[in-house]
Structures are given as structure tokens and as C-alpha cells.
């Protein structure tokens, strides 16, 4: 048994004396003193262990092999003090056991089970190392601080044969005494979380096992005291089955490819990924460095139209073409712009579909009488119409940017084709073409710049001559147009200085150059001669503007008619009130006269005269108001007729425009399908596919518009129906929710006649005037109803022509309402004659009663 010294005295075994610089110092930490001062029979053979490295270890220095034991012990004591302080910024030295399979750095547990102190130390760059006790020298190439991005170190580490000895220890689980570490994974990160993890490594503390019960009790009491003072209990070390000679041989054989067999592995606690992940990251970084020349600003995205994909045929086939990678690079650069154009066209299709759906909803809510919802839908439809006006159908190949680039590509193709033709006719067919093309392009660049400057100056001179010489305006304008066109061609060549297509074009064969040149020429020529016309012509736009102005006029006149009818209704209520009060006052006057109350009779007479004067003024004002309302009604009828006629013309012209647009779209689709089936250029194939998908979206939009109502007249139809309802309510049916308004003027006249029968001394003149006013009012209403019937007849003819079943049923309901109104007025006019005869006989009856 070792340790024959006195109890509690520090014992240094011969192994410590061999290399005291690597032994465990007695003053590493206060909580470790109790564990190191055990009796000799309770301590195992002292060997090398695992500890923290000092900052000096992480730096290469020439005198590292010549450290004395005193210096090593001093540095270890400082490292122990730093290791006990969780907040310290120093790094401890790690000196430990020999490089054995059973004493290597274990796998780190998952972060979810770490102690809070360990989590706080996770981001601190603490260095540790594993090295052999028999050699104090350190390898300068492995003592540097490791960073997560230093993939070269991990490649060297992974390629080392000595790392194979780490596998058994990485799979070994820890004892129950290691707190805070629950899950052990193989091949985990070689990073630790702080001093607590280093203190809990297997083999860090002196271990001892015994079968004596009093020794086991002593060990348990020492462990409890260590836990109470903040030190983890000791753990059982795995048996060491390897001799030092075998270890030295294994270490030398594992380090043979790297030079010095005795080296120090230095790690960083920031390294969180596993070794397999680091190898994968290294491989992915190497792949990214190889693909660094490819632009990553855009990505290849597909398009939604399956028909365009199927009709493409050989459009995307880049096989057999020179430098297919270059064409795919161009595709990736232009794909986002093509997708933007297609998204705009798809949005227009969505807006058209939404407009048609909202039209149907608006018709339903108008039929249900929910005018608030109808107004909300009308506003939404106006917003959608504005958005649809901002969007425009256009082929992507005719957009300015893409069209300019295709022109530039066509110019480069022409230059390459010319060079290929010259090369084919020369004596040396093997002469390099790319150098000639680059020289030609470089020589033509200064000439193009000079030509551009001269063209700008010439254009300015010609503009001044145009201002001075009006007589030569036509000739100079023609010359200016030619110069502007040439200037635009030169600008196209100078607009893409950073896009070098010569390297791509130079690798194409003459046949491919001829094919691409022909395809580009057809595309640009068709765009210049017959552009993709989707916008309506000027006549159709002017007709739409006129229809909108008439629609606003219909709204204004309808509002005036409705307000006039409301004012007439309020005047009628006031007249009805006066008609109710006057007979009562007349009766009270008669009672006062019969009772000889002449003063009361005089007051009642004055009040009767005042009310009669007010009634006369109201009747005069009501007559003027009725005349104004009648004129507004006639104007409304005329404007609505013009509006209906404009709508019919607009529908005819719009249908003709859609027919022409549909025919042009079908023709364009046929041309694009033919081009896609014959061209093998990837870029042109993708552009033509985008054009084909745009044409398909336009056809879907036209089909939706044909299935539903016309999108340009949806708001006018709703307002038109609203105006018709208002006019019908104002002219045909006198709707008065007030109980007194339910009385017709004839009924008021009958009540007046009934009350006047009680006062025979009243004159019959006012009743004749009332009868005349009522007759005039009834005549005006009959005239308005006649105009309304004519208007309804025109609308019925239009509904029959357009086969609009909903409008036809609505007009039938309005006609039925007008018929009922006419029948009611006829019934009211029949007792009018009887009332007139009775009013004529009232004075005679009154005179007879007076004589009696």
C-alpha cells in the first residue's frame, strides 16, 4: 500500500516525482483539500489527470518543454483559482491522465439538462487539452484556440488515426454522481460547458474502492462534505488495462502522419456541432466555393400553366448546346422579371373574376333590398375597376427591359454569325473564334461611343433647325426619326456593358447562331409590326367616358326628383293639417255665433283667415314645386334614354373588341407554340413559354367576361336600377309613411266638403280652387306615369335583346306596380265628379237653410 506518511500529509508518489509539472497540486481548490488529505491506504496511485489549460498553453512558445516543476506548480495553482471562479476571464490548464481509451473526454450532455452555472459558462472560450504525462512538450500547430469556423483543424483531427481511440470512451455513460448531465450521445461535440464539467470528468478525482465497511462509510462522509462545500463527489474510474509502453506506441503510431507524436489538442467551448456535422459543413463549404461564380440573387421558379409546359416541347432542352451552364445563368437572371410579368397578368385575371362575383352578389342584395351592402359592393367594384385599369395585358417579350436585352443578344448573335461565316470561308478553320469576337467587340466600343456622341450633337442641331425653319418641318422630322432610331440601336448595344455574352455566343456553332438569329428577328419584328393589342381603341374609351358622365347625370337627377318628392310630401302634410283645423275652427265659430260670443267669433274669424292665407301660399308653392319636379322627371327620362343608347353602343363595340382580341390571342398562341416546338435555345424557350402563359390567362379572362356580365357596365347597371326604383317611387306611387300622408288629395277634399256642410255661410270659391289644384296634380302624375311606361317599354326591349332574365322579371314587377297605381287613381277620380257636384250644390243648400 502506498502512502505510508502521516495521516493527512500530502503524499507524492514516485510517479509525481517523475514529472511534478503534470501532477495534481494539493492546492487546486479549497473544496479539494479534504479529498487529497486522505490516509495513504485510501489513495490510489497518483497518475496524470485532466485539468484546465492556462492561457499560455494555447499559445506556441519555444520554452514550453523546459518548464521547471516550480513554474508548473505555480501556474497550476493560478489555474485552480481561476477555475473556481465562474465569472473569471482566465483559462485554466489541463494536466491529466495518460492518453488512454478509458480516460478521454466524454460526450457532452444535451443543453436542456445543464446546470445554470454551466449554461452561463457555455459561451466562454475555455480551452482544455488531453496530452501524455510522459512528455511535457506541446505541439505548436495544435495549441491555438479553435474556432467553429476552423474546418481545417477538424479535418486534421478527423483524419488522425489516434482519434479512433476516442470512440470507446465517448459511448461510456457517466456515473450517477455527475449532476446536471443526463443524456450521453456518441460522437458529440468535444466542447465542455465550464469548470463544473471538468471537475466531473471521469478520472479527474482520486478514486478508491474497498470492501471494508468502515472505509466505505469514510468515503461516503467525505463525499457528503465535499457536496456541502460545493465540490462534486468522487467517481469510480474505469480499470486501466494498458501499459505505458503500449500507450506510447499507440500515441506514436497515431501521430506518425502529423510529425511530432507528442502534441496537445486544444478545443474551444464555442464548438457546438458534432464531428459528423463539422465534416458535412466542410464538404458543403467546399461545394459553395466551387459554385461561387453562379449568381445566387435569383432562383429558378416554375410557372403555373400546365398547358404552357406541355406545349413547350423542346423549349427547355439545352442538351447539345455549347455552354448550357451560361444559358441557365441567364435564365436565373431573367426568371424573376418573367415571374413579375406573369403575376401581373394573373392578378388581372383574379380581378376580373372577383368583379364578376361581386356583380352577382350586388344583384342579389339589390333584389333583397339591402342597399347598404349594395353601396359597399359598388365602392369595392370601383376600386377593382381602378386596379384593373392600372394593370394591362402585355407579353413579357414586349416589355422594355426584356425587349432591349433580346435586341442586345440579337446584335451579339449577328456579330458572332458574321465571324463564324468569315471563319468558315478562311483557310484555317481551326482558328480560335472567341479572341476575334472579343477584339471586334472591344474595337467597336469606342466607335459606338463616338457614334453616339455625334448622333446626340446632330439631333440637337436638327432640333434647332426645326424650331427655326418651320417650312422644312416634315423633312427634318423624318431625318430626326431615323437618327433617333439609330441612336436607340446604339444605346441598346451600350446598355449592357456588364453582360458579356461573347463567351457564350463564341461557343455556338454557325447553325445554332443562324437559328437563334432568325428566332430573335421574328420575335422583335412581330413586336414592332403587330404589337399585342389588349387596350381598347380610342372610340371605345370615349364611349365609356360618355356612359360614365350620363350615369352621373342620372344619379343627380334622381336625387333631385327624390328630394322634390320629399318636399312635396311635407307640404301635403302641412296642407292636410290646415284642412283638418279649418273645419274645426269654422264649427267653433258657428257655436260662438249661436251663443252670442261675438268676441270669440271675431278671434276665430281672424285665425281662419290667417290659416287660409297660409294654405293659399303653400298651395302656390306646391304647384311650383310640382312643376319643377315634372321638368326634372322629363329631363331624367331623356338622360336615361341617352344613357341606355350609349350602353347599347358600348356593349356592341366592346363585344367587337373582345372578339378581335380573342382572335389575335389565338393567333399569337399558335405562333408561340410553333416557335417553342422548333427552337432549342433555353432563354428564348422560357420567354416564349411566359408569353404563351400570358395568352392563356387572357383567354381565361375573356371567357369569364363572356360567362358573366360585362365588367365595364356593372356599376352603371346598379345605378340605373337604383334610378329606376327612385323614379318609380317618386312618380308612380306616392309613398308616405305618415298616417296623414296616406290620405289622397281627393280624400282631403271630401273631408273638407263634409265639414263645410256644417257651415253654409262659407263661400264655395276655395273648394273650386282646391279641385282645380288636385286636377292639375293628377294630370301631371298621369303624364309622368306615361313617360315612365315608355321608358319601361324600352327597357323591356333591351332586356329581351340581351336575354337578361333577371332584368326582365324586375321590369315586369315595375309594370305591375304602375298598373295598380293607375287603377287606384281611376278609382279616386270617379268620386271626384260626385264631389264636384256636391260642392256646386253646397251654396244652394246653405241659402235654403238660411231662408228656413
Curated annotation (Swiss-Prot):
Ubl conjugation is among the record's keywords: yes
Biased composition (Polar residues): 65-79
Record region (Required for localization to punctate cytoplasmic foci): 437-594
Stretch list, region Interaction with TRAF3IP1: 295-693
Keyword set, alphabetical order: Coiled coil, Cytoplasm, Cytoskeleton, Developmental protein, Microtubule, Mitochondrion, Neurogenesis, Synapse, Ubl conjugation, Wnt signaling pathway
Ranges for region Interaction with NDEL1: 802-835
Gene knockout outcome: Loss of function of DISC1 in the dentate gyrus of adult mice results in reduced neural progenitor cell proliferation and the appearance of schizophrenic and depressive-like behaviors.
PTM remark: Ubiquitinated. Ubiquitination with 'Lys-48'-linked polyubiquitin chains leads to its proteasomal degradation.
GO molecular function, one term: kinesin binding
Coiled-coil stretches: 367-397, 449-496
InterPro entries cross-referenced by the UniProt entry: DISC1
Region of interest called Interaction with ATF4 and ATF5, as start-end residue ranges on this chain: 595-852
Region (Interaction with MAP1A): 1-294
Region Interaction with NDEL1 and PAFAH1B1: start-end pairs: 728-852
Region (Disordered): 1-86, 236-264, 280-320, 706-746, 833-852
Cellular-component GO terms for this entry: cell body; central region of growth cone; centrosome; ciliary basal body; ciliary base; cytosol; dynein complex; GABA-ergic synapse
Biased composition (Basic and acidic residues): 253-263
Documented effect of changing residue 822 to Q: Abolished interaction with ATF4
Expression sites (tissue/organ): Expressed in granule cell precursors within the dentate migratory stream during the first week of postnatal life and in differentiated granule cells of the hippocampus (at protein level). Detected in heart, brain, kidney, and testis. Expressed in dentate gyrus, hippocampus and in the olfactory bulb.
Region (Interaction with PAFAH1B1): 728-852
PANTHER family (alphabetical): DISRUPTED IN SCHIZOPHRENIA 1 PROTEIN
Protein name: Disrupted in schizophrenia 1 homolog
Gene: Disc1
Amino acid at each position: 500500500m502506498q502512502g505510508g506518511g502521516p495521516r493527512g500529509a500530502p503524499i507524492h508518489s514516485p510517479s509525481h516525482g517523475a514529472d511534478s509539472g503534470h501532477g495534481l497540486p494539493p492546492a487546486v481548490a479549497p473544496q479539494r483539500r479534504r479529498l487529497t488529505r486522505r490516509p495513504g491506504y485510501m489513495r490510489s496511485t497518483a497518475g496524470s489527470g485532466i485539468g484546465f489549460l492556462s492561457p499560455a498553453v494555447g499559445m506556441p512558445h519555444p520554452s514550453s518543454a523546459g518548464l521547471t516543476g516550480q513554474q508548473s506548480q505555480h501556474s497550476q495553482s493560478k489555474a485552480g483559482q481561476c477555475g473556481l471562479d465562474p465569472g473569471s476571464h482566465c483559462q485554466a490548464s489541463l494536466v491529466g491522465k495518460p492518453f488512454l481509451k478509458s480516460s478521454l473526454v466524454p460526450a457532452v450532455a444535451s443543453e436542456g439538462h445543464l446546470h445554470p452555472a454551466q449554461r452561463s459558462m457555455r459561451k466562454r472560450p475555455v480551452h482544455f487539452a488531453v496530452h501524455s504525462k510522459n512528455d511535457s512538450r506541446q505541439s505548436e500547430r495544435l495549441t491555438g484556440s479553435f474556432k467553429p469556423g476552423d474546418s481545417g483543424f477538424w479535418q486534421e483531427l478527423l483524419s488522425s488515426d489516434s482519434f479512433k481511440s476516442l470512440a470507446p470512451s465517448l459511448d461510456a455513460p457517466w456515473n450517477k454522481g455527475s449532476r446536471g448531465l443526463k443524456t450521453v450521445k456518441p460522437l458529440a461535440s468535444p466542447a465542455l460547458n465550464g469548470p463544473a464539467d471538468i471537475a466531473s470528468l471521469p478520472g479527474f478525482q482520486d478514486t478508491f474502492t474497498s470492501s471494508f465497511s468502515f472505509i466505505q462509510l469514510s468515503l461516503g462522509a467525505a463525499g457528503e462534505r465535499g457536496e456541502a462545500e460545493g465540490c462534486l463527489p468522487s467517481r469510480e474510474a474505469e480499470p486501466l488495462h494498458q501499459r505505458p509502453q503500449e500507450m506510447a506506441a499507440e500515441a506514436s503510431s497515431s501521430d506518425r502522419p502529423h510529425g511530432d507524436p507528442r502534441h496537445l489538442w486544444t478545443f474551444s467551448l464555442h464548438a457546438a456541432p458534432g464531428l459528423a456535422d463539422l465534416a458535412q459543413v466542410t464538404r458543403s463549404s467546399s461545394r459553395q466555393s466551387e459554385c461561387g461564380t453562379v449568381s445566387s440573387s435569383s432562383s429558378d421558379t416554375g410557372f403555373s400553366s400546365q398547358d404552357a409546359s406541355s406545349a413547350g416541347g423542346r423549349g427547355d432542352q439545352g442538351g447539345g448546346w455549347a455552354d448550357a451552364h451560361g444559358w441557365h445563368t441567364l435564365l436565373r437572371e431573367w426568371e424573376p422579371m418573367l415571374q413579375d410579368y406573369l403575376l401581373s397578368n394573373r392578378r388581372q385575371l383574379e380581378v376580373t373574376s372577383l368583379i364578376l362575383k361581386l356583380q352577382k352578389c350586388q344583384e342579389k342584395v339589390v333584389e333583397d333590398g339591402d342597399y347598404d351592402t349594395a353601396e359597399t359592393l359598388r365602392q369595392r367594384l370601383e376600386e377593382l375597376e381602378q386596379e384593373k385599369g392600372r394593370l394591362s395585358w402585355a407579353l413579357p417579350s414586349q416589355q422594355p427591359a426584356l425587349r432591349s436585352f433580346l435586341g442586345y443578344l440579337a446584335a451579339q448573335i449577328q456579330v458572332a454569325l458574321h465571324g463564324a461565316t468569315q471563319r468558315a470561308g478562311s483557310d484555317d478553320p481551326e482558328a480560335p473564334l472567341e479572341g476575334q469576337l472579343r477584339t471586334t467587340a472591344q474595337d467597336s466600343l469606342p466607335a459606338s461611343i463616338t457614334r453616339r456622341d455625334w448622333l446626340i450633337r446632330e439631333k440637337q442641331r436638327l432640333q434647332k433647325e426645326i424650331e427655326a425653319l418651320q417650312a422644312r418641318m416634315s423633312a427634318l422630322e423624318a431625318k430626326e426619326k431615323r437618327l433617333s432610331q439609330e441612336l436607340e440601336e446604339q444605346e441598346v448595344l451600350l446598355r449592357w456593358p456588364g453582360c458579356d455574352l461573347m463567351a457564350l455566343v463564341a461557343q455556338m456553332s454557325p447553325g445554332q447562331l443562324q437559328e437563334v438569329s432568325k428566332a430573335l428577328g421574328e420575335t422583335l419584328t412581330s413586336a414592332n409590326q403587330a404589337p399585342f393589342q389588349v387596350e381598347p381603341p380610342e372610340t371605345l374609351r370615349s364611349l365609356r367616358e360618355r356612359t360614365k358622365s350620363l350615369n352621373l347625370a342620372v344619379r343627380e337627377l334622381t336625387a333631385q326628383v327624390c328630394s322634390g318628392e320629399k318636399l312635396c310630401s311635407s307640404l301635403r302634410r302641412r296642407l292636410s293639417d290646415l284642412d283638418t283645423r279649418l273645419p274645426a275652427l269654422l264649427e267653433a265659430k258657428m257655436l260662438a255665433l249661436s251663443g252670442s260670443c261675438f268676441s270669440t267669433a271675431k278671434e276665430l274669424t281672424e285665425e281662419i283667415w290667417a290659416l287660409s292665407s297660409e294654405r293659399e301660399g303653400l298651395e302656390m308653392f306646391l304647384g311650383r314645386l310640382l312643376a319643377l319636379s315634372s321638368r326634372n322627371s322629363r329631363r331624367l327620362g331623356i338622360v336615361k334614354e341617352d344613357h341606355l343608347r350609349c350602353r347599347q353602343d358600348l356593349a356592341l363595340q366592346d363585344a367587337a373588341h373582345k372578339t378581335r382580341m380573342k382572335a389575335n390571342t389565338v393567333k399569337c398562341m399558335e405562333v408561340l407554340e410553333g416557335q417553342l416546338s422548333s427552337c432549342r435555345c433555353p432563354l428564348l424557350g422560357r420567354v416564349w413559354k411566359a408569353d404563351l402563359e400570358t395568352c392563356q390567362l387572357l383567354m381565361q379572362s375573356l371567357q369569364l367576361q363572356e360567362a358573366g356580365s360585362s365588367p365595364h357596365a356593372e356599376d352603371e347597371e346598379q345605378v340605373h336600377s337604383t334610378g329606376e326604383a327612385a323614379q318609380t317611387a317618386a312618380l308612380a306611387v306616392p309613398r308616405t309613411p305618415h298616417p296623414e300622408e296616406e290620405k289622397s288629395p281627393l280624400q282631403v277634399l271630401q273631408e273638407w266638403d263634409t265639414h263645410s256642410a256644417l257651415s253654409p255661410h262659407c263661400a264655395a270659391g276655395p273648394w273650386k280652387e282646391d279641385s282645380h289644384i288636385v286636377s292639375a296634380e293628377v294630370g301631371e302624375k298621369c303624364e309622368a306615369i306615361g313617360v315612365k311606361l315608355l321608358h319601361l317599354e324600352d327597357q323591356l326591349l333591351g332586356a329581351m335583346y340581351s336575354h337578361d332574365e333577371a332584368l326582365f322579371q324586375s321590369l315586369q314587377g315595375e309594370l305591375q306596380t304602375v298598373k295598380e297605381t293607375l287603377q287606384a287613381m281611376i278609382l279616386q277620380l270617379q268620386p271626384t265628379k260626385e264631389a264636384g257636384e256636391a260642392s256646386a250644390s253646397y251654396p244652394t243648400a246653405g241659402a235654403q237653410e238660411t231662408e228656413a
